[in-house]
């Protein structure tokens, strides 16, 4: 039985939205959810355009993740000139200085890590997000990002190394 496009949306919309939310980062803007929803719609519009040519035995989930990743990378390129990384770092530093050292320390650490992940190169950010937040294995990541499994592993390794160094520098 062939999968209908509507079924594909029902099965994967929330998962793709969550992936894009994590990949794009929630920078505290009120309209961040709207931006991610718009990007999710773009993913499914692109998927609809090529759905008829998709082989029935294809991995639909990986195919959607690949489209989502490409849409996110396109969005990153569009936003690059608008986003000032220095202001993000300054804002993170101010948040860290004003944070209390009581029970909110775990939440503060999560915010620091989230800010650092958002500052990673796009491919490393995608690999870390797919591996640790979406819980995908390296073959799936490689398929989604059109790279080798070794390339996916290397990007995750480099990202983790970068995050560790940045966290050590903050201490």
What is each residue range found by the language model?
Residues 1-25, 34-37, 48:
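A short, charge-rich alpha-helical start-of-domain segment used by transcription regulators
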Residues 13, 17, 44, 121, ...:
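C-terminal flanking helix
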Residues 26, 42-59, 78-80:
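Sigma70-family region 2
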Residues 38-45, 58-70:
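Structural recognition of an alpha-helix C-terminal capping motif at a helix-to-coil junction
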Residues 55, 66-87, 106:
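Arg/Lys-rich amphipathic alpha helix in sigma70-family domain 2
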Residues 69, 145-169:
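DNA-recognition helix of helix-turn-helix
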Residues 82-106, 137-140:
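Internal acidic/polar
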Residues 127-131:
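A short pre-motif secondary-structure segment
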